Amino acid sequence: MKIVVSRGLDLSLKGAPKESGFCGKVDPTYVSVDLRPFAPLPLEVKVTPGDQVTAGSPLAEYKLFSGVFITSPVDGEVVEIRRGNKRALLEIVIKKKPGISQTKFSYDLQSLTQKDLLEVFKKEGLFALFKQRPFDIPALPTQSPRDVFINLADNRPFTPSVEKHLSLFSSKEDGYYIFVVGVQAIAKLFGLKPHIISTDRLTLPTQDLVSIAHLHTIDGPFPSGSPSTHIHHIARIRNERDVVFTISFQEVLSIGHLFLKGFVLGQQIVALAGSALPPSQRKYLITAKGASFSDLLPKDIFSSDEITLISGDPLTGRLCKKEENPCLGMRDHTITLLPNPKTRESFSFLRLGWNKLTVTRTYLSGFFKRKRVFMDMDTNMHGEKRPIIDAEIYERVSAIPVPVALIIKALETQNFEEACRLGLLEVAPEDFALPTFIDPSKTEMFSIVKESLLRYAKENVVTSS
């Protein structure tokens, strides 16, 4: 199936590393296992500071679903268990042993029954890789998904491409074969043909995939790479019982690597990007999953007060505090560095804005059709919070036809029934990142949706499963 998306916005941000750039290798001293994505689920920590762990060792377990573990990506020693407000679990920090783990696993995918395969996924931390829709929560083992969507079309700013992720392996063919094994495992686990969404520029091993998966391509501006866009065009979610699972290309590689090679895939590709980073430092690295920022960035840049650190891309990433020695998030493959200006731009309201991004023709650049305008992004808000006036501008950049402003208003009044009627079941917080970015009212739509979905999932979805 060929999907063409017309709505959205092509973001050309300054600071992207060169796609042809060489991938250097960094073996970090510290890594962390990010537990924030599991916020709707109560977790039981299985380790204490001082414990020795190996790649694949259980670090935490789902309290409500016994036997589902979150595991360590590396060998090392647990040094800290970080908690936030109300003792909420944030991450488990590990002092990594040098080198790659040699802990060997032996699973024969062909001989495993579906029931045995599920136990392997739960035990080895593979089930924790899936996300569940609606409500964008960690996948629950009590649910049987209607469909599984595998995303190979992620086009968030600065996110490494599929080709870059294949740099982890000796050859592109080797990487694709590992991916095929991962797809085979998913198809057998759930007894269905998963949907694989890629772009036209990718050359997939279709002869190996066509019998075990549905293949689709998508074309269009950001956010055409969003799983919500794929689900909407291929098989829409129409009610709360319409459960689907989503998973990324990199996570399928982790599944295939365990079954084919017998080792935990503890490495990942990371992009160092952002306009605050000198061009010579913008690059791709091969490093451990959850690596600490201080091991990947030059000391003078990491400690600078004029730079904002983000784990992930600039639109959906997590703001990090330097004093907490931040590490990469669970699903993050980018470290973004943005300038943090201390003063506002003088007479900004009088400037023509030839190189400023606008979707409302506030600046001169909005009246000229140029193929690409490279925007120099920083953390300046360029104004204060205002009431929502023009609700139509959000629909211009939303790839899914949902009334963005009405959903936000329903969520702010905690009217979930109305929000679901308007289309909340089809979306995730990341789908509101672009409307938040272009919003003249400065409303934090991304945060509103994220917190509302978390609250609703805790009270209604997780406890009833």
UniProtKB/Swiss-Prot annotation:
Name listed for the protein in its UniProt record: Na(+)-translocating NADH-quinone reductase subunit A
Organism: Chlamydia trachomatis serovar L2 (strain ATCC VR-902B / DSM 19102 / 434/Bu)
InterPro entries cross-referenced by the UniProt entry: NqrA, NQRA_2nd, NqrA_C_domain, NQRA_N
Any one biological process term the GO annotation gives: sodium ion transport
EC number assigned by the record: 7.2.1.1
Reaction(s) catalysed (UniProt annotation): a ubiquinone + n Na(+)(in) + NADH + H(+) = a ubiquinol + n Na(+)(out) + NAD(+)
GO function terms (MF aspect): oxidoreductase activity, acting on NAD(P)H, quinone or similar compound as acceptor
UniProt family annotation: Belongs to the NqrA family.
Keyword Transport in record: yes
Keywords: Ion transport, NAD, Sodium, Sodium transport, Translocase, Transport, Ubiquinone
